Amino acid sequence: KRQTKCIMNIIAVVVTYNRMELLKRNIRCLQQNKPISSIVIVNNGSTDGTTEWLAAQEGLTVINQTNVGGAGGFYTGIQYAYQAGADWIWCMDDDVFPRADCLEQLLPYTGKKDIGILAPRRLLEGEIFTHDFQAYNLSNPFVSMYSKKLAGRHITSPTEITGTAFEGPF
């Protein structure tokens, strides 16, 4: 069950647009074994009832704005979390469903001096996500942006990465 006390100020930032059912599942999945200080939902101008549903929810911080895209939503949410004094910010889209122990698995690495971002392993319908790589090279349009594909479903020790998608980085 979810604990009620949080030692670190951990703020989850979720960006959503017109995917209310996915958002509901995402919020349920954020009820982690280790507590999150707060959940910030950046609603990018949803028109499917999400705005009204969010207004009726308790325990969420909701930022309603016009649709400025995913990156714009993350900018808004990360800025809010930073100004709120977050020690760690957990970013994700509304279609990301972290396992109940995901945060618990990430927390032991937060005290290490050489770690600035933690990225959990991404699975799609229980299978390894096909584009999970250790590095993304966006500087040359003539070569693949992917390098060093991660192999194996379970990674038993931390693996250095130089980039990640906005699908669960902490």
Each predicted region: which residue ranges?
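Short beta-strand-to-loop acidic/aromatic patch adjacent to the donor-nucleotide binding site
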Residues: 86-95
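Short, acidic, metal-binding catalytic loop of nucleotide-sugar glycosyltransferases
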Residues: 28-37
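Short beta-strand/loop segment that forms part of the nucleotide-sugar
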Residues: 37-45, 63-64
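N-proximal low-complexity "stem/linker" segments adjacent to membrane-targeting elements
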Residues: 1, 5-29
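Conserved donor nucleotide-binding strand/loop of the catalytic core
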Residues: 54-72, 76, 80
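Conserved donor NDP-sugar-binding/catalytic core segment of glycosyltransferases
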Residues: 101-133
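A conserved acidic beta->alpha catalytic loop
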Residues: 29, 43-52, 96
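A recurrent flexible, glycine/aromatic-enriched loop bordering the glycosyltransferase active site
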Residues: 153-170
